[in-house]
Amino acid sequence: MTTPSAATSQDLPRPAPTSPGRFAWIDWYRGLACILMFQTHAYDAWTREPYRQGAYWDMARMQLGGFPARMFLMLAGVSLMLRYAGDARRGLTEWQARRGAMLRGLEVLGYGLAFRLGEWLLSGASRKDIPELFKVDILNCIGLSLVISALFFGLAHVRTSRPPILAAITTLAVVFLTPVIQRWPWPSWLPAPLAAYLWDGTPLGTFPQLPFVAYTLSGGFVASLWLQAVARGRLAQILAWTTTIGLLLAVAVQWGNSRGYALFFPTPTVTIPAYPSSYGYRIGMCLLFAGVSYAWTSFRGGGGFSPLRTLGQASLLVYIVHVEMVYGRLTWSLHHRLHPVLVTVLIVVLTGLMVGLAWVRVEIIGKRRFQWPLRRSDRSS
């Protein structure tokens, strides 16, 4: 069974009625992540040799392909803080809010497990592919990272100006200690399907918590600053700062890499360690993309149809459908057989189909008389 190794998403709760459209740019940002996800998976699935190397491949698959998963993980942290903001407006207690956040994380984890089961069944339910049922893909990672992040963030971080210092310290610990931990074998007493959630020590661990939970914690931390800025009417100014910091961080890391400044180096057992520089570059670019999303939606205004915003509002659905279209039996004859130019044309077609599907989900199924139970968190906000 062939499955993607890049990104997916979860749907973020909408802002409460008291702040219509204030965070609508996040939908656009999530839609941008969807576009990058489509091209990453399509180039990976359909590009033939000898084009799976060189500058084109490095840019399309390795560079741009590294962003969607991190963007969705960061957005998971943002969604957690938006959820807490809604909980605070409804007068929930700290325990009720954190419990609800953890249950949401477990719900997303359940989506991930159900998705693996569905993929296995659609691929023929082969016995040799049973281990694929336990592969830790991005939905699994997002779900568990939400559960963990709920331990570090709470209502106090949206009701007061107190920054989530413990979350920041934990993020740095994850970033700098993961390369060391990666050198360890996973615990022999722990079954491989469970060990795969820890770090990249098993074939099943595509998206282990170490280091990927750092992106969700980072999203929660940054979102707490954005929410405090909203309360003071200074969201644009704070976003300008976080965008600038992100850009400077990404540039500084790339400059350091070009000079050979590295804290950790590959080993025979860990060929691609989770460099702190990799985190710095990726999170810096994620912050830059957030600023661009805010600037673009502010410039265009909130009215009218937006393909990216529509994709962002139905990101979970388009993830599930596009994975089957790209990697499934429907396009099996195209796998690793197409020229990049033809793949690019098909990506445009795929994107159009996904925008249409998202529009149906949002504008027809999403209407109150056709409520779809994919986004219960929206109705509770």
Regions found by a protein language model. Name each.
Residues 2-381:
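Alpha-helical transmembrane segments and their immediate juxtamembrane cytosolic regions
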